[in-house]
A protein has these predicted regions:
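A polyanion-binding, active-site-adjacent surface
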Residues: 2-263
């Protein structure tokens, strides 16, 4: 599948404006470590300390089951599966304890001949419920990010490091990443993307087998050890929702990744 990147300037600007990232186009010369922040005015009023009664907050916490030993993964069998049989196999996976708490697996979705493979970290509550990756607010932001570089969501393939949601949206555990790795590796082999965009620390470090902080991994071109596919690292959309000032850096990463395709 060939990407045309055919958005005209006015359309692209409309998507950037919708994301409140119009400044990305005009601040290219700034270092990633010197992004300007707007100081909000603060009003400090001296007053007597008044102790307020503490309100009781009811918090729901999902209880994780007793962890079973990681089941042996039949890598040889998985390596012979096509995408349809692989997805069916993933649906019945019980290789780690996450199968006890998931609502459903999240295999991935998109164009099977896509040039771009987008890999996130793990499904969240929305994804666990819908069975598709990036369907919540972070997914909406990802869609806008792709549009800004001329890509429709339907033109790429989107997956995660994990196929099941960790309880309470905690970070994936190493043994869970290991249990899912054969599935993801086979997906990559079958999809044969021209480039992989790794979203977030867990995705980047797992794919590239590195413990380097994600901030130091950005802005470089990597190649997967297993199949030499070019890989670019950037921040996860969920992080951008919490830290919108970092959007400019992600815009630079997206342009860098696109350049690898069209050069």
């Amino acid at each position: 599948m060939e990407n045309q990147f055919s958005l005209d300037e006015s359309t692209r600007n409309a998507y950037l404006n919708a994301l409140d990232i119009q400044q990305w186009r005009t601040r290219d010369s700034h270092s990633e470590d010197t992004a300007e922040e707007v100081d909000q005015p603060q009003t400090i009023v001296a007053a007597k300390t008044v102790r307020q009664p503490k309100s009781k907050t009811i918090e729901t916490v999902e209880v994780e089951p007793v962890v079973d030993p990681i089941a042996k993964i039949d890598v040889d069998r998985i390596s012979r599966m096509d995408l349809s049989s692989l997805e069916l196999h993933v649906r019945g996976c019980d290789a780690c304890a996450l199968h006890k708490t998931r609502k459903q697996t999240v295999f991935g979705i998109g164009h099977h001949k896509a040039d771009w493979l987008i890999i996130g970290e793990a499904p969240g509550a929305d994804e666990d419920r819908e069975g598709e990756p990036f369907v919540g607010r972070a997914g909406q932001l990802l869609t806008q990010m792709l549009r800004a570089i001329g890509l429709a969501r339907e033109e790429v393939f989107i997956a995660n490091i994990l196929k099941c949601r960790p309880p309470n949206n905690r970070d994936p555990k190493p043994e869970e990443v290991s249990a899912c790795s054969a599935y993801l590796n086979r997906q990559i082999q079958l999809l044969e993307p021209k480039i992989i965009l790794a979203l977030g620390r867990t995705a980047a470090q797992s794919l590239l087998q590195s413990d380097v902080p994600i901030g130091k991994m950005r802005g470089k071109l990597y190649h997967l050890k297993t199949n030499n596919i070019p890989t670019v690292v950037t921040y996860h959309p969920a992080y951008l929702l919490r830290s919108p000032k970092e959007k400019r850096k992600v815009w630079e990463d997206l342009k860098f990744a696109r350049q690898q395709i069209i050069s």
